[in-house]
C-alpha cells in the first residue's frame, strides 16, 4: 500500500485524515513510504482533521485544535459514565482504553494495542459502540462524537471533525471540495467519515485495507489514463 500511496502522490495531491495521532502517522504512513519523491503533495491530518501537518524540508504542524483542561475532564468523565451505563466490558483488553490526543479523546474498546484480528470481529455492525455513543451524545451535547475504525469512538470540539479538515484543505491548498474524492470506511451516519459526505465531497465507501488498495489502484489507473495524449491512446497494440 505504501508504494501505491507514493505513486498516487506523484500524480495528484493526497491528504490522509485519520483518527490516529501524529506518532501513528509517523510510524504507519511516513516511515512506510519508499524513499525519494516529493512529499509536498502529501497533507497529513491526524485526529480526524483536528491537526494538520505539511512537508517543507521537514514536517510542520499548521494547526492543532486542542481541548482545554476543563474540557478534557468533562469528556473523560462522560466516557467513564457512558461505558459503565452501556454495560460494555470486553473479556480482554490490550493497553489503555481511553487516550488523550490533545485535540481528540479516543475510546478504543479493546485497548490501544489490540490485534487487528480481534478488533475487526468485536463490533462489525457497530451495535456495541452505538450504545455508548447514544449515551455520550446526551452527556456531551457540546462536542462532536463519532465512531471510527473497528473499535473506536472519537470526541472532538464541536464542528471540528473531518469536514473541518476538508475545509482547511480547500483554504490552504486552494482546491475546491468539488475537485476532491474521499475514500473512507465510516461514511454511515454517526461514523467519523460521515461529515465529509455531508459536506458534499464525492465519497467512496471501503470495507478494509484490501478494498482500499483496489480503489487506489483504480484511481491511479484512471488518472494515468487521463494524462495520456489522445494520439498515444489511439496507437494500435502489437498482439504478436
Which residues does each predicted region cover?
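A short acidic, often aromatic-flanked loop/helix-cap motif at beta-alpha or helix-coil junctions
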Residues: 50-54, 152-154, 210-214
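Short glycine-/acidic-enriched loop or helix-start segments at secondary-structure transitions
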Residues: 25-27, 56, 117, 192-193, ...
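Short, well-ordered coil/turn elements that cap or connect secondary structure elements
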Residues: 9-11, 39, 140, 175-177, ...
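Mg2+-dependent phosphoryl-transfer enzymes with acidic/Ser/Thr/Gly-rich catalytic loops
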Residues: 156-158, 162-240
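Active-site phosphate-binding/coordination module
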Residues: 2-94
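Conserved acidic, metal-coordinating active-site core of Asp-based
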Residues: 90-181, 192
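Short, solvent-exposed loop/turn segments at secondary-structure junctions
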Residues: 22-23, 51, 112-114, 151-152, ...
